[in-house]
Amino acid sequence: MRRLRPVATVLGALGLLAGAVAVVTARVDVPRFVVVGPASFAPILLCCTVLGMLLCLAVRRWWIAGASASVLAIAGTVVVPLYVADAAPSAGTPITLMQANVMLGEADPAALVASVRDRGVDILTAQELTPEFVDALDDAGMSDVLPYRFAMPYPGGAGAGIYSRVPVTDGRELDGYLLSSVTARVDLGTGPVRVYAVHPVPPYPTPTPVWAQEMAMLRDELRTAADSPEPVIVGGDFNATHAHARFRALLTDGWSDVGDAVGAGIVPTYPTDKSYPPLVGIDHVLVRGVGATSSTAVDIAGSDHRGLVVELALR
């Protein structure tokens, strides 16, 4: 054990440093990649802190273990609530929404349509639509399953769309975003519901200040939507995690993340096209005036994202 002490001390110190980086970058709102980048991987950095703390406990390096425990306690104020459901599942008219990034239109359209059909999806919010992929979805039967849509597909995969089993009205594309984000209304029998499919740019390779600006624009859009009495649902590839201050700033004015509301915890959704598991949870469904029942991550064949299927309750 004595021989292991120097190694454990070094690893423990590195773990402590990793945790400190995670905590600091998650707490500050600085639109620079040196801050935003590490925050994206905060859960992984905190796992390093846990391992380092355990090693230091084993070799009795108490001060490193104690400091690591303090860092983890601070991080826990953000992480632990993600695993605790807000309340009992809400009563109301049940609806199922799927959120899917289709990777520049490279996802398998037939598999996506089958997933929508098998899961009884009422609304699909999709990002990275191309004109060819929209046509391929129709050929695969999407128009039979979700016959109504408001979609703005673009060559290269910059598009977005909302598909629905009931008519879609008042569709518009949000101004000022490099990648398309759209909104429209649907009525599932309880009155109009505003739905968004959003896609802020990533903080890299896009300049991080542009990402920060688009997140601020989205915050303003959601604040405006909160002024309306109608329920609102936002499905999107936010290119942001709960460790980003800009994402948490969206969760005000009555907004909640469905995964957070049902206690789903940290759900990595990207990337899925590598030899290792997805590392970051950047796909989310936000709601206001809508109850949340469940949230499940699902595979999107051919995409580099996992999708989300959420069960909601319209009050």
Regions flagged by a language model, labelled:
Residues 1-2, 190:
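Intrinsic structural disorder
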